[in-house]
């Protein structure tokens, strides 16, 4: 029996009516998906203690490369390596708008000259205790969550290699479901802004922070990886409608103290 989320786009699998037309096994039984994902996770944790910690303490460049190599071998029979020649897997602390991103540049009419899967370090190192809901799957650990995000980017890579483009909604979901059991493309993880709001840090909040041996008081106007705080200052470059002047500071969230309303 076909699961309901998959049924909506099952007709799109007609473009691969015979599974043996693809250069890898498709679709995979759910038990096989779980087994292969567990093999990847076990191998990565065995070679990188920092990645195995909860929360994740660190991840080596070699671990990112090993992750791609294992997925290509276990799920794609080497197809990605053959199609692209090389895919760089990198970790970016500046990638905060998404948990991962697939990028490529073409050379000539069809051959792909360079491809990269950029994973968000900001996402990885904020994960703590599960369960986490990503792409329709519930996973227990930060490491599994990271793998599920990586699988999503791999689907972009394989769709692009097979069809010359990626992002065709129904086709992409068919691939993601058949390869990894994904039934959605969204996650329920809180954004930095939502996490900060739960601690009272949101635009309009009054805060204080230490600066050059003193304490400054201001108002939060934006929350991201850091907070933008406007501090009243007669010589400041910013002015409000009442004519008051301010200096703008970008402050790490952990350095801010929310001031209670009196």
Predicted region positions:
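Metalloprotease/metallohydrolase-associated module, dominated by Zn2+-dependent proteases
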Residues: 10-11, 28, 46-144, 161-262
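Active-site recognition of the HExxH zinc-binding catalytic motif
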Residues: 148-160
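Non-catalytic architectural context of zinc metalloproteases
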Residues: 2-47, 147, 256
């Amino acid at each position: 029996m076909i699961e309901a989320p998959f049924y909506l786009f099952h007709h799109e699998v007609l473009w691969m009516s015979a599974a043996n037309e693809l250069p890898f096994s498709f679709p995979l039984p759910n038990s096989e998906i779980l087994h292969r994902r567990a093999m990847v996770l076990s191998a990565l944790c065995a070679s990188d203690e920092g990645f195995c910690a909860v929360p994740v303490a660190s991840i080596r460049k070699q671990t990112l490369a090993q992750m791609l190599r294992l997925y290509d071998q276990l799920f794609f029979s080497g197809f990605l390596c053959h199609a692209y020649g090389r895919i760089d897997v990198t970790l970016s602390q500046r990638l905060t708008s998404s948990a991962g991103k697939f990028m490529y540049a073409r050379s000539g009419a069809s051959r792909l000259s360079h491809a990269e899967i950029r994973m968000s370090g900001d996402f990885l190192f904020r994960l703590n205790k599960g369960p986490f809901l990503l792409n329709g799957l519930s996973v227990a650990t930060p490491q599994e969550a990271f793998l599920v995000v990586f699988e999503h980017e791999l689907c972009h890579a394989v769709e692009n290699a097979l069809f010359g483009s990626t992002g065709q909604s129904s086709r992409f979901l068919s691939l993601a479901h058949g390869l990894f059991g994904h039934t959605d493309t969204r996650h329920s993880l809180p954004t930095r802004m939502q996490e900060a709001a739960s601690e009272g840090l949101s635009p309009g909040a009054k805060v204080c922070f230490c600066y050059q041996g003193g304490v400054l008081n201001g108002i939060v106007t934006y929350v991201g990886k850091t907070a933008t705080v406007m501090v009243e200052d007669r010589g400041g470059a910013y002015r409000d409608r009442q004519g008051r002047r301010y200096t703008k500071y970008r402050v790490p969230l952990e350095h801010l103290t929310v001031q209670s309303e009196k």
